[in-house]
Each structure stands twice: as structure tokens, then as C-alpha cells.
UniProtKB/Swiss-Prot annotation:
Coiled coil: none annotated. Binds to 23S rRNA. Forms part of two intersubunit bridges in the 70S ribosome. One of its GO terms (biological process) is translation. It comes from Wolbachia pipientis subsp. Culex pipiens (strain wPip). Part of the 50S ribosomal subunit. Forms a cluster with proteins L3 and L19. In the 70S ribosome, L14 and L19 interact and together make contacts with the 16S rRNA in bridges B5 and B8. This is Large ribosomal subunit protein uL14. It comes from the Bacteria. The keyword rRNA-binding applies. One of its GO terms (molecular function) is large ribosomal subunit rRNA binding. PANTHER family: 50S/60S RIBOSOMAL PROTEIN L14/L23, LARGE RIBOSOMAL SUBUNIT PROTEIN UL14M. Keywords: Ribonucleoprotein, Ribosomal protein, RNA-binding, rRNA-binding. GO terms for cellular component: cytosolic large ribosomal subunit. The keyword Ribosomal protein applies.
Length: 119
């Protein structure tokens, strides 16, 4: 579960390393895998596409909290991670690192195709 003021890792090569959740879209109190959130970059790679302190949108791809699959099994990741997206919902980076939970929304198919492993 991702709430406001949650520190998250970035799972793509957009240039951001760590981000802070500053808002949730849809009027929710918490976000899970596949939800879109508003983030602020806290630490960056100097050669990246993003700037420190700027506000971006991101989609949650991994959460520490257990997520049940349709067959009854449970998936739990070791970190909370996001992929930065633009206003059209396309990822800012060209690669996605680490495993990604299957995103049910059809608008994030590009993220699933860039991922190494989809669970």
C-alpha cells in the first residue's frame, strides 16, 4: 500500500533513483499495483531525463504488501517501485528493471512489454 509521503524506488532508466509520493489520483487513501500516483523526485542520476524536485506522474509496479493473484497465490516484493510516465501514459524510460506485477489496465501494455519479467 502506497500512501502520501512514501519513499519509492524507480524501476526504469528515466534518471530518477528515489521518489516521494505526494498525491494519489482518484481520491483514494492508498495505492496498489497498477494505480497512478503523483511523485516528486528526491535523488537523480545526473545524465537522466528528469530533474530533482520536479513533479511527475508514475504507475506503481511493485509493492511490499501482499497481492493476491486470481489463482489464489500471493505475490510479495522486497521493495516498493514505480515507473515514471508522461501525460499520455507512456513510460519516460526505455527499460524497466526487475519483475513487474501484471498490470490489468490496457493503457500500460508498453510498460509490461519493456519489463524483464511479468508475474
Amino acid at each position: 500500500m502506497i500512501q502520501k509521503n512514501t519513499l519509492l524506488e524507480v524501476a526504469d532508466n528515466s534518471g530518477a533513483r528515489a521518489v516521494l509520493c505526494i498525491g494519489l489520483l482518484g481520491g483514494r487513501k492508498s495505492a496498489s499495483v497498477g494505480d497512478t500516483i503523483i511523485i516528486s523526485t528526491k535523488s537523480i542520476n545526473p545524465k537522466g531525463k528528469v530533474e530533482k524536485g520536479k513533479v511527475y506522474k508514475a504507475v506503481v509496479v511493485r509493492v511490499k504488501n501482499s497481492v493476491k493473484k486470481s489463482d489464489g497465490s500471493v505475490i510479495r516484493f522486497s521493495s516498493n517501485a514505480v515507473v515514471l510516465i508522461n501525460d499520455q501514459g507512456e513510460p519516460l524510460g526505455t527499460r524497466v528493471f526487475g519483475p513487474v506485477k501484471k498490470l490489468l489496465s490496457g493503457s500500460f501494455m508498453k510498460i509490461m512489454s519493456l519489463a524483464d519479467e511479468v508475474l
